[in-house]
Amino acid sequence: MKDSLPAFEKAKVLVVGDVMLDRYWTGPTGRISPEAPVPVVRINQLEDRPGGAANVALNIATLGGQVSLAGIVGEDETAAALTTGIQALGVEPKWHVVADKPTITKLRVMSRSQQLIRLDFEEPYQQADSQALLDSAANSLADVDVVILSDYAKGALIEPLAFIQQAKSQGVKVLVDPKGSDFSKYRGATLLTPNLHEFELVAGAVTSEADLVEKAHKLLEEFDLEALLVTRSEQGMTLITAENKELHIPTVAREVHDVTGAGDTVISALATSLAAGSTMAEACAIANTAAGIVVAKLGTSTVSRIELIESLSDTHHSETGFGVVTEDQLMYALEQTRLRGERVVMTNGCFDILHAGHVSYLQEAQAQGDRLIVAVNDDDSVRRLKGDGRPVNPVGRRMAVLAGLASVDWVLPFSEDTPQRVIARLLPDLLVKGGDYKIEDIAGGKEVIAAGGLVKILCFEDGISTTKIIENIMANQ
């Protein structure tokens, strides 16, 4: 697969929010303390990882984007460790220092890949601290394409409305990872990325897909938002826009070890992609893939460009369902294919006994675009068209042979006499047919043309047909 990711190195992003340090103390445990019924952990590994808004910034830097980070820290050893950690990966710190408060720290004690306890070191920040941070961050708006507000309700983003309006007035997109049940503080933002629980806290319980979309549109209007991206764990994520467009993206996670920082990964990949020129739909697909990678890791983690490319390639070759597919599987595969900007070609036929003419025709069809769909008449459909004694090969075998050709990406059956319904649903960019047809007589052609696609006639190789092959076999018996 080609590297279809945008030029992340061109992305310029400012992250503003609650920064913290995630500390991991790890070691074996083999006995219970005589002082209390708790395990004794013999610590042999210490690790610091930037967390919260700092993890968002690290994700952007790891993807290759240019990123600066504005947050509140104390005047302490933890702040120094946090600064060292982000600068080492190319993140520019823009701290507001509050000397009488500790830098927020989450200390986790680990053993055998399990978290035994978490200790939090923090004190809430005041309105004056938050305002000073936002005023300082506003000075960087002219240098960026996208701003992320990473809200963990620790006090960095108490009243960000004026900052959002200032960013939007300068043409800067504002993405928000929200916290709590009050979305009014984010009014006017470009996009919010609540998880389903956060969404329901504001909109009420979701009873169906249609209900989710309806509730989302109400929030878009109420809070003057351009879009909502609702992350839904194993159900993937759903994008709803003020332009009445909805896109559901299924999850791509293979294994889930730790959801720590998954929301950070989603919004960082989304922002980096948008800043690099991706559409909203493209950026959401990339963010979904990034989230699937990070939940397979233990602890707060980042995702690299190489990991994204490899994961997108794996998804492209498996979960999008190459080979023999159902219509629903193919609809999702096409959604992902079009996000990558690939041209889809479609043809159809009985393909009862695959011969050299078929092979050359399918090769020519595939050469017209990037991906080729072959719709195949099922057995009853062939029988109605060709008469008793046909098909020679049942539909399962015919599709298996077609799917084995290098020129064919997807094969699916249809039961009608013509594939018009299937073509009208799939709407390829190019519909091709072999033989002496007129374009206006090709099933599904009108629907494809009406949708902005093309219809093309290709030539079959002379002197080769399934009927002649069958006649020759019968004559030689």
Swiss-Prot record:
Per the record, the coiled-coil ranges are: none
Q: Which domain of life is it from?
A: Bacteria
Q: Name one GO molecular function term.
A: heptose-1-phosphate adenylyltransferase activity
EC supergroup of this enzyme? transferase
EC number(s) reported in the record: 2.7.1.167, 2.7.7.70
Catalytic positions are: D264
Q: According to its UniProt entry, what is the function of this protein?
A: Catalyzes the ADP transfer from ATP to D-glycero-beta-D-manno-heptose 1-phosphate, yielding ADP-D-glycero-beta-D-manno-heptose.
Task: Write down what this protein is called.
Answer: Bifunctional protein HldE
Native organism is Shewanella piezotolerans (strain WP3 / JCM 13877)
What lineage does UniProt assign to this protein's organism?
Answer: Bacteria, Pseudomonadati, Pseudomonadota, Gammaproteobacteria, Alteromonadales
